[in-house]
Each structure stands twice: as C-alpha cells, then as structure tokens.
C-alpha cells in the first residue's frame, strides 16, 4: 500500500470494517481513510490525572479511582444499577440504566475501579450517570491516559472506542501512504505540514494543554481551519464562475409599467429603495444572470423593490416567479402584487402545497401557457410538474430558510432555450458581514438602509409572566381608550403546528374571558389559507382589537394601527426572529411597544439576548449580537437548510481570518484550478458543495 494516496484507500481495508460497519460510517460521510482523518474531534477529555472525589464539582468531567463499597439493582420506576466507590476523601455513586449481569459481577465489593464521566450533584452527594469505567488490576498505581482523549462526532451504532481504534490505523497508514498537499508552496511554507497537523489533533502530545485546543489557535488547528475556509470560499467562487458562463436574457431599460406603478402609489420610494432598484436594473440589463442579495431591515420596503424588478421582466413579455418560505407570507405577497399589478393588466398566479385537484391544474396550465406573468408561491413552485413559459426572473424571499440547493433548483428549472433566469434574493434578517462574506460570497449584495418616513422606533420591555394580569390590563387600555390594535404571539419549543395551534387556542380562550369587551381574532398554521386570510383582513381593516397568533405572523403583515405586541416565552426564539415579530408594530406614526413576557427564572444567555432587543432597534446590530450568542449555524438556519456546517472552522471565532482567506481563495481560483477543485472535494461532501 506504500505510496498510495489516502483518498483512494477505502475504509473497508481497515481491520474491523466489514459491510455493516462500512454502511454505518457512510452515514456520517466517511468512505475513505482520508475522510476518516478529516473527521476531527469535536472536543477533548482530560483523563491524564485523578480528581479526589471530595473536590468534584457539578458539570466537571473527571477521572476518579476508588474501591467498590457496594453495588445494587433497584426496581423502582425504572430498572437501575448503582455502585458506590470511595477514594478515602469522599463517596461517588455511579448509576447505570443499561447494564447486564457481567457488569454487576465486575463491580464486586472491594474491587478497585477507574471511572470517567460528568460529575452531578445527587441525593447522596456526588454521582456520575453511565460513566466509562475500567476495573483495575492489583497494581498500586492506576493506568491513566498519557494524552488528551479525542471525542468524535458519531452516529447510532458507532462507539467512540471504535472511531479511536480506526483512527489509530489511519494514522499508521499516514506513515506509509500520502495525503495530497493542496496549498500552493508559497502558502504552505512556514506552516505545519498536513500530516503533522492531523497527528496532533487526533492524538495530542502529552505536552499539549486542553486550553490551547479549546482556543482554536494551535498551529495544527490553524492549518486545517485555513484549508476548510478556503474550500468553502473556493466552492462559492466556482458557483459564481459557473453562473458567469451561463447566458441570461438582457432586459434593457423600459420604464412604462414602472412609472405607472409609482404614479399609483400614495407614497414616494425612499432614496435607498431607488438606489437598490437601480443596482438591480443594471444587473438585469446584462447578458449574464443577476445573482443579487437584497438585505433590508424589517419594514424597509423590500417588497416594492421586488415588484419594480418584476415589472422590468414583465414589460419584456417574460414571467417572474416569487418563492416565499411559508404559505401565509406567499399569500400576503400574492395579495400585494395583485393590488399593484392587476390595475396594470398583469395576471398574478398563486401556487402552494395545499392547492389540490382542478384548481392546481388550472393554475399550472395558466403558467405553462404564459397567461400568468407573475407567479407567487412556496417551494411548490419548483416541483417537476410546474412548467414555465419564459421565466426571466426568480425572486426568493427569506433566503436562509431555503438554502443554496433549493435556490439553485429553481434557477435550473427556469432555464429555457439556453437562457437562465436572473435571481434576486431578499432577506429581512440582516446578515453580519462575517457571514455574508462566507455563506453568500456568490452573491452581489444591496442593502436598503433607510426606513420610510413616519416610522417610530418600538420601545421594548421584558416582564415576567407573574405580571400577566398587568399586561392584560395594558392591552385593554390600548385597545379601548387609545383606539389601537394589538398582537399576542404564542411560541412553543416544539416545531409542531398542532401543539402551536393548541397553545394559541388556549390563550385565545383565556383572553376572551379576561377581555370580553374586545373583539379578539385567532390565526395559526393549521387554519385553511382562506380562514387565515379572512382573519388577517378583518384585523387589517380594524374590525378586531386583538389578534392572537403563532409565529406565522413573523413576516409580511402590515397593519399601521397596531402599536402593541406581547410575545410569550420570548426566550424560546432567536433574536432575529424576535426582531422580525417586533417589526409588525411601529409601522405608523404612533409610539409602539413590544412586551417580552418571559417565564422566570431566565438563564444568563436568555437575559443577555432579551437585553439586546431592549437596547436596539437596528437589525444589523441585533444580527451581530445573535451571531455572538448563538453561533453561525443557528443564525444562518443551516441546521434545516443544508448549507455547510464546518468541521474545524468556527465563523465567529475565526472571523479575523476571513479577509485573508478570501484573498488567498481568489489567488488559488485563478492560478491553481486543479488544487481549488481538490480542496473543495476534500472538505465538502457533495451535498454541501455550492457549485453546480
């Protein structure tokens, strides 16, 4: 096997990897020995020294040694084995819920045991639940680990011990086989070599302290972080270059419809809206597909900008598709566009997952014939049976609910006669610059950084649920004496439409009893679109005082007379989502308030997050704080959307590297195309690559 490249050596060549194990390893993206070596530890455990039992603190992971005092099996609510050990300084209880007779026999009274686990405070003092343990021989000194112990990302059926044994074999192969050096020589010089970095991170030497690795600043980590960030940037550059090779239909200046729409509006667009519209129109006049991200804070008027872009395509006789993440938001867009476009003689169509039978078929036929020029909907728009007729512009609202792959699917779908549609992505969740530079590096960015005149900042307060009756009085006062309208938003931890609907219904019933003088509406995700629309319309027209809702009203609802919002359990939502919700009030000239009605006690993190909302109404400031508190994965929504997760890099911790990474990535992309592609393939599974 000497001299072979490790990306060509299958894991099945390692001892202990048969067909069943291969299948399990493939589930976590491990196929070759190189994949295994790049499957880096999530964290490390320090098992190099003993802790006296008396000094154990809750939450500390520690190795202890002691003599077994007793072991018992109990049959209470759940079958359990407990074993108490003592080291002379104190007593530790080990609890096991999964055990067998051999374990019970091995933990006989008088035996010496070495155990590792997380210390907790139990009923009878310190305890560990399911610690790893080893029965010691008669040796007077315990057999401790000499180096830090790696803990790997794993999946069902693959134990840590298995991954450690396989990694040992992979590291041995690193002595006789090669792993390609993909960094240009001028960059690799002076850095730790790749084999040395991998050895260090999989099996840290005894001299290496845990604190060094936790900081992410060790040279071995920096070497791999650089490679991984480069791979992601190169993937974006490849996507960008790929798009530039495609042709789009140039849509030159023709402002007939645009001028008609602007003349019909009761307001004048802001300077920022005009500037961003000009940037979009410039891109759409080119013969390469526009790929532009429009960021705008809540209420900045992105929908009008999207409408003006749509008119540029429609005036040329082409179709436009707008995709929104939820049916309610898609309905809202459809209504807005109908109000604006139907007086101009433009047919607006609507497609969503809930449409069935003849209505759906009729809509699809109208789209395929070109009768409908503006199509609004959810992801149902890019299902196979939907055929377009001259699709020239794709607008995607709330980008990071979809992810790169879904927007590429819609883009590919629009290809006709060798032309790809222009693409406009809108997000009301401002993206911190660090993330925009990595996750959206394939897009040009426009920012609508000006709110329409007459908007007033929302005052936000956090109040414990124990003062619920005071808040109900406040709602009564706002709705009866001040003539205002209010929202009451219910949130749930579970991602369940049914449970959310039940919670909202219960709150609705409670508030109807407490506020009989008010007309109170209810809207949630399980209602039929027509029902939701009827309630929203009644609220918008002032027929209801108070609207009880789930987070379905997060985006797109515009009721200028509403000036008070109560958000229950705000600690369950991210800052960006709370900021979105809050954006439903403060849309008129009157002073508006948002009450964060939380359950005590709040964790320190939750306190910090709610304080950010009280301090700021600026979406970009809030997004940066959200990044610092929650981390990039949650902020970008990558848990759901399949955007890339990182193996060793951390966008928050490593943000200072991003400008250098971008510069180096451009250099490699231009000068070393083969290495660029190899870096992408090394670090990014096919499902996560951005390139087509």
Where is each model-derived feature located?
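Inter-lobe coupling/hinge segments of SF2-like helicase ATPases
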Residues: 275, 289-611, 667, 671-675, ...
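Short boundary/loop segments of OB/S1/cold-shock single-stranded nucleic-acid-binding domains
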Residues: 42-62
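C-terminal accessory region of SF2 helicases/translocases
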Residues: 589, 601-692
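N-terminal pre-P-loop "Q-motif" helix
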Residues: 267-290, 304
């Amino acid at each position: 096997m000497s001299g072979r490249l490790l990306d060509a050596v299958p894991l099945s060549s390692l001892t202990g990897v048969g067909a069943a194990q291969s299948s399990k390893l493939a589930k976590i993206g491990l196929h070759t020995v190189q994949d295994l070596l790049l499957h880096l530890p999530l964290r490390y455990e320090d098992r190099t020294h003993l802790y006296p039992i008396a000094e154990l603190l809750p939450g500390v992971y520690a190795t202890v040694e002691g003599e077994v005092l007793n072991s018992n099996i109990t049959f209470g609510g759940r079958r359990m084995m407990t074993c108490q050990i003592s080291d002379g300084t104190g007593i530790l209880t080990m609890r096991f819920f999964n055990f067998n007779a051999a374990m019970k026999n091995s933990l006989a009274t008088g035996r010496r045991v070495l155990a590792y686990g997380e210390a907790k405070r139990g009923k009878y003092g310190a305890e560990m639940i399911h610690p790893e343990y080893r029965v010691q021989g008669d040796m007077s000194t315990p057999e401790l680990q000499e180096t830090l112990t790696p803990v790997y990302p794993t999946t069902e059926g693959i134990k840590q011990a298995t991954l450690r044994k396989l990694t040992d074999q992979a590291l041995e192969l690193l002595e006789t086989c090669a792993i390609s050096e993909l960094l240009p020589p001028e960059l690799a010089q002076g850095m730790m070599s790749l084999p040395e970095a991998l050895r260090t991170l999989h099996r840290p030497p005894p001299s290496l302290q845990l604190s060094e690795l936790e900081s992410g600043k060790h040279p071995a980590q920096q070497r791999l972080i650089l490679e991984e960030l480069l791979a992601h940037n190169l993937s974006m550059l490849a996507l960008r270059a790929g798009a530039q090779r495609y042709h789009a239909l140039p849509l030159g200046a023709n402002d007939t419809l645009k001028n008609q729409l602007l003349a019909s509006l009761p307001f004048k667009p802001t300077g920022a809206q005009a500037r961003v519209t000009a940037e979009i129109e410039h891109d759409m006049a080119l013969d390469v597909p526009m790929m532009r991200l429009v960021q705008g804070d809540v209420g900045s008027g992105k929908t009008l900008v999207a409408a003006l872009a749509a008119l540029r395509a429609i005036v040329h006789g082409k179709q436009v598709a707008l995709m929104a993440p939820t049916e309610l938001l898609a309905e809202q867009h459809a209504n807005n566009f109908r109000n604006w476009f139907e007086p101009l003689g433009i047919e607006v169509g609507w497609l969503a997952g809930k449409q069935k039978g003849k209505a759906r078929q009729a809509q699809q036929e109208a789209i395929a014939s070109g009768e409908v020029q503006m199509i609004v909907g959810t992801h149902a728009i890019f299902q196979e049976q939907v055929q377009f007729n001259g699709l020239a512009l794709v607008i995607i609202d709330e980008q990071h609910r979809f992810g790169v792959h879904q927007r590429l699917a819609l883009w590919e779908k629009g290809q006709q006669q060798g032309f790809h549609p222009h693409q406009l992505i809108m997000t009301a969740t401002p993206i911190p610059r660090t993330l925009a530079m990595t996750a959206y590096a394939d897009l040009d960015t426009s920012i609508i950084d000006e709110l329409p005149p007459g908007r007033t900042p929302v005052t936000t307060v956090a109040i414990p649920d124990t003062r619920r009756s005071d808040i109900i009085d406040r709602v009564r006062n706002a709705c009866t004496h001040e003539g205002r309208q209010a929202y009451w938003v219910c949130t749930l931890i579970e991602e369940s439409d049914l449970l959310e609907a039940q919670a909202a219904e219960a709150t609705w019933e409670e508030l109807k009893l407490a506020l009989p003088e008010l007309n109170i509406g209810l809207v949630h995700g399980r209602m039929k679109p027509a029902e939701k629309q009827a309630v929203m319309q009644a609220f918008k027209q002032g027929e209801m005082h108070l609207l009880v809702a789930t987070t379905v009203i997060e985006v797109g609802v515009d009721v200028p007379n509403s000036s008070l919002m109560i958000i229950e359990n705000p600690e369950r939502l991210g800052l960006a989502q709370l900021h979105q919700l809050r954006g439903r009030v403060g849309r008129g000239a009157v002073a508006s308030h948002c009450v964060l009605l939380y359950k005590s006690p709040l964790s320190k993190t939750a306190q910090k997050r709610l304080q950010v909302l009280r301090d700021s109404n600026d979406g970009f400031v809030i997004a940066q704080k959200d990044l610092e508190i929650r981390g990039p994965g949650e902020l970008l929504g990558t848990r759901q959307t399949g955007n890339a997760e990182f193996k060793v890099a951390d966008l928050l911790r490593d943000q200072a590297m991003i400008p250098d990474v971008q510069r180096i990535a451009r250099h490699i992309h231009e000068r070393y195309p083969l290495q660029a592609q190899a870096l992408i393939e090394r670090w990014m599974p096919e499902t996560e690559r951005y390139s087509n």
